UniProtKB/Swiss-Prot annotation:
It comes from Streptococcus suis (strain 05ZYH33). Gene3D superfamilies: S-ribosylhomocysteinase (LuxS). This is S-ribosylhomocysteine lyase. Fe cation binds at residues 57, 61, 127. Pfam families: LuxS. InterPro entries: LuxS_sf (IPR037005), Metalloenz_LuxS/M16 (IPR011249), S-ribosylhomocysteinase (IPR003815). NCBIfam families: PRK02260.2-5 (NF002607), PRK02260.3-1 (NF002608). Homodimer. Its EC number is 4.4.1.21. One of its GO terms (biological process) is quorum sensing. Belongs to the LuxS family. The lineage of its organism: Bacteria, Bacillati, Bacillota, Bacilli, Lactobacillales.
Amino acid sequence: MKKEVTVESFELDHTIVKAPYIRLISEEVGPKGDIITNFDIRLIQPNENAMDTAGLHTIEHLLAKLIRQRIDGLIDCSPFGCRTGFHMIMWGKQDSEKIAQVIKSSLEEIAEGITWEDVPGTTIESCGNYKDHSLHSAKEWAKLILSQGISTDAFERKPI
């Protein structure tokens, strides 16, 4: 007999959210009391656009570095298959407003301060698809996202 499961992100009505936003998906408590917090980092409006894979890939590599420079406890920040944002998984209880600030400042650095030499994991030894990167695209997406403002609410625009 198969266990019935609900996948939260498939229950979310993607037609009513207003990207870009940061949304707390869940706080899970492990068997020893450890808390893991999962965020929806939605940068592009679902079903209206999607990031090209090269730009998304470069943003992914940069966020892996930039988030860790700004906040402790990052477990992973991985792109959605739909290419509209990322899952961000953290140790402990985390504040959505703080996460929004971290993402905003990371995107600001991508848009204005990053050079190709700053992008980690771009060699054949360090990346499984090292030829599929575009810093130009990453910068353009970061600028577009920042121009729209990052909201702390998925359903009502409350840009930080």
